[in-house]
């Protein structure tokens, strides 16, 4: 990556050009209270001005209250107009909450504890972190396994439909907040948080986004939060992956530089290297879907 200042200027120019090229009136962004959307919001304001940005906060029943508080605070600090729209009524209407009856548990702490208990059991039986095994056939029946996957993914897809509705209603471009680390290993929901019109940080590893956040003076409360999709209580990014972003990014950067698996195994645990390499290959295959016939 360039210096933080150079990269910021490069992205801001990119955002201005995209708006002119697409002949749109501004940008719409979903703001979660997390690091990636905070960085992108800061870049948008500096690139095109707060009057050309609209923020949406889209919590649901499982969203941590602090996430919404931090998202509101950042948008108000940047003087960006925004709306808060609860996804709970639609998800309830679809019957999503019945599939994972967390509402029966009285406190968030208890919900997090139960979710992690199931997650740890899955990891033990699958012999790898659940993220790296979610596309495989489980060796044994796992309670709530597929329901949990569907529960997680539908939230991203409902959010995406909502974001696009408001983007098109205002003749805005929808800006995405997926980073390069997530893209390379498929740590996103297809037809969910990967979908957007402009992806200004998709070329930056998570650790590089973190560097930009310091340069852009993203509030410390956001910078210090563990990265989390905030869709199921108790599950953070690194808990789901079973690996921290510093290690993940070093492995991914090593692959980008042409290092072999054996080279990387001299520096990192062999099982982690294998998981990451296999996941990168699988993600490349996943991006080729849907399957289609060629013309006869």
Curated annotation (Swiss-Prot):
GO biological process: NAD biosynthetic process
Protein name: NH(3)-dependent NAD(+) synthetase
Subunit structure: Homodimer.
Species per Swiss-Prot/TrEMBL record: Coprothermobacter proteolyticus (strain ATCC 35245 / DSM 5265 / OCM 4 / BT)
Residues the record lists as binding Mg(2+): 36, 182
GO MF terms held by the record: ATP binding; glutaminase activity; metal ion binding; NAD+ synthase (glutamine-hydrolyzing) activity; NAD+ synthase activity
Biological role: Catalyzes the ATP-dependent amidation of deamido-NAD to form NAD. Uses ammonia as a nitrogen source.
Annotated EC: 6.3.1.5
Family per record: Belongs to the NAD synthetase family.
UniProt entry keywords in alphabetical sequence: ATP-binding, Ligase, Magnesium, Metal-binding, NAD, Nucleotide-binding
EC supergroup of this enzyme: ligase
């Amino acid at each position: 990556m360039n210096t933080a200042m150079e990269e910021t200027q490069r992205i801001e120019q990119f955002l201005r050009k995209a708006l002119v090229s697409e002949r749109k009136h501004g940008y719409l962004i979903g703001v979660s209270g997390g690091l990636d959307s905070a960085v992108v919001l800061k870049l948008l304001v500096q690139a095109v001005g707060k009057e050309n940005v609209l923020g949406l906060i889209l919590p649901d029943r499982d969203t941590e209250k602090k996430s919404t508080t931090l998202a509101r605070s950042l948008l108000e600090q940047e003087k960006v107009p925004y709306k808060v729209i609860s996804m709970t009524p639609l998800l309830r209407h679809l019957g999503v909450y019945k599939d994972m009856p967390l509402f029966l548990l009285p406190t968030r702490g208890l919900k997090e504890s139960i979710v992690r208990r199931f997650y740890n059991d899955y990891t033990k039986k699958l012999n790898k972190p659940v993220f790296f095994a979610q596309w495989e056939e489980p060796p044994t029946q796992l309670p709530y396994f597929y329901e949990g996957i569907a529960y997680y993914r539908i939230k991203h897809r409902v959010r995406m439909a909502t974001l696009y509705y408001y983007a098109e209603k205002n003749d805005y471009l929808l800006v995405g907040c997926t980073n390069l680390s997530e893209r390379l290993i498929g740590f996103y929901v297809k037809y969910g948080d990967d979908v957007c019109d402009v992806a200004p940080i998709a070329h930056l590893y998570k650790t590089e986004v973190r560097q930009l956040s310091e340069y852009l003076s993203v509030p410390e409360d956001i910078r210090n939060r563990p990265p989390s999709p905030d869709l199921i209580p108790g599950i953070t990014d690194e808990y789901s992956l079973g690996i921290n972003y510093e290690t993940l990014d070093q492995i991914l950067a090593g692959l980008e530089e042409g290092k072999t698996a054996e080279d990387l195994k001299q520096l990192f645990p062999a099982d982690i290297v294998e998981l990451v390499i296999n996941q990168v290959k699988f993600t490349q295959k996943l991006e080729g879907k849907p399957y289609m016939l060629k013309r006869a």
